[in-house]
């Protein structure tokens, strides 16, 4: 079990003990348990219930949303973390936060906002901004510290510990902090000697891939967009493997071999015959449970074996036990498990996200975001919520004011964005 220090539990704004306890009661929770609770009770997390995962939140009876996906990632993260001796609350919290910065319409909305945002838009960087600025919890002399999470918690939530712009002026496609948040990133990364994310963030990222690949395929099967019979269609499978290797890395042969291993699982064969009967629903749920357990077990076992084989690589003055944790150690994902996850992700992308109807819907979604951005920027601060009006007033440059509008739109649910788009269209029609 890794021993976390007072340095790991430090918060940007110091906090004393709570003063509202009933007489003779006391606070038993640790710092990371409090971090987890703050995220769990946040409005930003609740808003994910009305944000797209693969199919929209209103497609079908029980589709996954960004919120349910985040809960599943959090559970998987906790399981892997416990197996590796990491703090389970910290790992679970990282899973809860991993999509909290996503705007309406998921990656499609992310791309649209990136087109209009001076300084770029990235869901992971927006996560840090929400946790450290936008989600109201801790205010000191009119300065917002967001949820005021611990150093280790913010570090665990940051899987891309980079700013958008590098010292040489080049830019990163994926990054965990906007340039204006560089000081916050430096604070949470203090003590790191390389550019790798901490163990807890690695666990979160892996858990996201597992949940995404398994559960999104499950949703695709239920919606009728996916059938696992494709794993037996060698012609279709070959084309699928080529596209998957191009999109997610590795080779087509690795994905074809992964399909062969999956075909050998009885639960895959049962789920391939899904027909909405009670037995089919049970078979599908058995499959998702088995696959999650298959990949969690593979990752945990491989990582622990690597630690046992080379404990001296982790042992130092700051980590005398040589345990895995924070900046000590790397997650090991076996090649076979990684290939199977890539194959399942490919199935989800090609048979759900790249369907013509889905692509046409994405075009309409982008148009809404552009329309709302133009409307809110033109009428700001009056078009902004009260809290964002305050951010607007405090902004000193056009770029900062534009960022406030982007923050407002990114915080919206999809339902609210669509109402705002209708309002913006009405105003445009009136002005024409």
Predicted regions and their residues:
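C-terminal subdomains that position terminal phosphate/3'-OH groups for nucleotidyl transfer/ligation
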Residues: 248-400, 412, 432
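Intrinsically disordered or highly flexible coil/loop and linker segments, enriched in small
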Residues: 45-49, 86, 136, 140, ...
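Alpha-helical scaffolds flanking conserved acidic
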Residues: 33-34, 84-97, 147-157, 200-201, ...
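Acidic, carboxylate-rich catalytic segments that either coordinate divalent cations
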Residues: 1-22, 366-379, 390-432
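Secondary-structure capping and boundary motifs in well-ordered enzyme cores
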Residues: 62-69, 89, 101-105, 119-123, ...
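Glycine/alanine-rich phosphate-binding loops at beta-alpha junctions
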Residues: 15-68
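Alpha-helical phosphate/pyrophosphate-handling elements in metalloenzyme active cores
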Residues: 59-90
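Sequence-structural signature of the catalytic-core scaffold of metal-dependent phosphohydrolases
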Residues: 1-23, 27, 40-46, 75-78, ...
């Amino acid at each position: 079990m890794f021993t976390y220090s007072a340095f790991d539990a430090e918060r940007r704004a110091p906090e004393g003990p709570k003063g509202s306890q009933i007489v003779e009661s006391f606070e038993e929770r640790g710092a990371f348990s409090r971090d987890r609770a703050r995220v769990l009770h946040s409005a930003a997390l609740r808003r994910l219930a009305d944000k797209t995962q693969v199919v929209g939140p209103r497609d079908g009876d029980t589709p996954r949303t960004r919120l349910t996906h985040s809960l599943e990632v959090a559970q998987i993260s906790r399981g892997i973390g416990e197996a590796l001796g990491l703090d389970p609350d910290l790992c679970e919290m990282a899973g809860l936060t991993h999509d909290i910065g996503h705007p309406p319409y998921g990656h499609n909305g992310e791309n649209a906002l990136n087109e209009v945002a001076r300084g770029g838009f990235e869901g992971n960087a927006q996560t840090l901004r929400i946790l450290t600025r936008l989600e109201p919890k801790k205010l000191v002399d009119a300065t917002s510290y967001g949820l005021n999470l611990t150093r280790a918690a913010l570090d665990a939530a940051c899987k891309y510990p980079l700013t958008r712009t590098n010292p040489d002026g080049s830019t990163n496609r994926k990054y965990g902090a906007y340039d204006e948040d560089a000081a916050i990133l430096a604070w949470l990364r203090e003590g790191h000697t390389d550019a790798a994310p901490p163990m807890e963030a690695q666990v979160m990222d892996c858990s996201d891939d597992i949940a995404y690949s398994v559960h999104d395929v499950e949703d695709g099967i239920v919606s009728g967009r996916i059938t696992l019979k494709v794993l037996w269609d060698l012609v279709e499978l070959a084309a699928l493997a080529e596209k998957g290797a191009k999109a997610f890395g590795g080779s087509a042969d690795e994905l074809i071999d992964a399909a062969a291993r999956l075909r050998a699982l009885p639960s895959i064969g049962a789920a391939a015959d899904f027909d909405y009967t009670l037995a089919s629903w049970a078979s599908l749920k058995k499959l998702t449970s088995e696959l999650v357990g298959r990949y969690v077990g593979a990752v945990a076992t491989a990582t622990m074996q690597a630690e046992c084989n080379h404990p001296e690589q982790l042992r130092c003055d700051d980590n005398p036990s040589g345990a895995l944790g924070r900046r000590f150690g790397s997650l090991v994902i076996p090649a076979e498990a990684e290939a199977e996850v890539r194959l399942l992700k490919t199935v989800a992308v090609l048979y759900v996200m790249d369907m013509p109807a889905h692509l046409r819907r994405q075009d309409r979604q982008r148009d809404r975001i552009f329309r709302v951005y133009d409307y809110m920027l033109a009428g700001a601060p009056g078009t902004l919520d009260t809290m964002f009006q305050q951010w607007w007033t405090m902004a000193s440059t056009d770029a900062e004011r534009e960022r406030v509008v982007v923050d407002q739109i990114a915080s919206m649910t999809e339902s609210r964005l669509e109402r705002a788009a209708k309002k913006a269209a009405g105003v445009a029609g009136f002005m024409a």
